Amino acid sequence: MATSGIQTKVPGIVSGFIGAIGRTPLIRLNTLSNETGCNILAKAEFQNPGGSVKDRAAYYVVRDAEKKGKLSRGGTIVEGTAGNTGIGLAHIARARGYKCVIYMPNTQSQAKIDTLKFLGAEVHPVPVAPFSNPLNYNHQARRHAESTPNASWTDQFDNVANLLSHYETTGPEIWDQTKGTVDGFTCSTGTGGTFAGVTKYLKEKSDGRVASFVADPPGSVLYSHIKTKGKHPDNKGSSFTEGIGQGRITGNVQPVYDLIDDAMKIPDEKSINMFFRLLDQEGLFLGGSSCLNVVAAVEMAKILGPGKTVVTILCDSGHKYATRLFSRSFLESKKLFDVIEPQYKKYIVLP
């Protein structure tokens, strides 16, 4: 049963930035829960100290590098990231005495790039290139680390320390917060660490009872890969969402691939309307990937049926995307303005 009102029971004193990571609330989305007859619960990962779910993985991949002797004090953390992992890494770099170098696609919001620079990171926005291309931002990050003394490429996409962060923290938190009543889990994947770690934990803890569905944006290969068992992967299309979707099966997804029960492709039209609906009806200002995840949770609830408890992830807030998602010209450029429901157009206040 969800508690109401402002809560006064809080964790005790924690040690620094890293001590503040995790233990995020699980929010019941009341209007959607009432509409579906299910409990739709969303993990408020935007409450992590760096502002996103990626703080968990950022800490674990740095700790992994330290344990393996790849990184010592004064060294350099190097990563390829769409933004949020980089922000988490930059915070941790400041806290632990490292330099931080980030390579990222030049399609990401300027707010993400600026935030990384504010945190002292060296940022290299590079043209978008597929993973098979040596100019892909991840490969450029790897080469930078290889050519820099005392530098470690943390390899968030294939380093299973990412998966482990969610297997050891996010998954157990969800299980404890729902008192083991969770019936379904769904979220999108970028690296796949959140989806994989939570799926692995909930499957093991429930003896396979908890269903796990991948939520995929247009332009990502996972939906078609799962639906055709890898025979006809298709990544046609594109999405306004940032940091999710994938053109391959990453090293974090591979270990749980056979545990995936189903996949859903979520069109941008539904995600953008959910962005405004959550603001309008729930008072939640979230990023595009979070809104896609909530659409997926609603779809999963309809599939599982009334009375079920479905959990998803609220990856980050909407602040880094505001200049785009409240902009008529941006929405028109993505062919989204005309599909937004009339009652939500009052929020589009930027030219």
From Swiss-Prot:
Alphabetized Gene3D superfamilies for the sequence: 3.40.50.1100
Disulfide bonds: none
E.C. number(s) listed in UniProt: 2.5.1.-, 2.5.1.47
Domain of life: Eukaryota
Residue numbers bearing the N6-(pyridoxal phosphate)lysine modification: 54
Bilayer-spanning residue ranges: none
Catalyses which reaction(s): O-succinyl-L-serine + hydrogen sulfide = L-cysteine + succinate; O-acetyl-L-serine + hydrogen sulfide = L-cysteine + acetate
This protein's record includes keyword Transport: no
Main location: mitochondrion
Transit peptide segment: 1-29
Cofactor(s) the protein requires to work: pyridoxal 5'-phosphate
Free-text disruption phenotype from the record: Causes cysteine auxotrophy.
Binding site residues for pyridoxal 5'-phosphate: 84, 190-194, 289
Location in or out of the cell: Mitochondrion
GO molecular function, one term: cysteine synthase activity
GO BP terms in the entry: cysteine biosynthetic process from serine
Pathway connected to this protein: Amino-acid biosynthesis; L-cysteine biosynthesis; L-cysteine from L-serine: step 2/2
Keywords: Amino-acid biosynthesis, Cysteine biosynthesis, Mitochondrion, Pyridoxal phosphate, Transferase, Transit peptide
Main function: Catalyzes the conversion of O-succinyl-L-serine into cysteine, the last step in the cysteine biosynthesis pathway. Can also use O-acetyl-L-serine.
Family to which the UniProt record says this protein belongs: Belongs to the cysteine synthase/cystathionine beta-synthase family.
Listed name of the protein: Cysteine synthase 1
UniProt source species: Schizosaccharomyces pombe (strain 972 / ATCC 24843)
The encoding gene: cys11
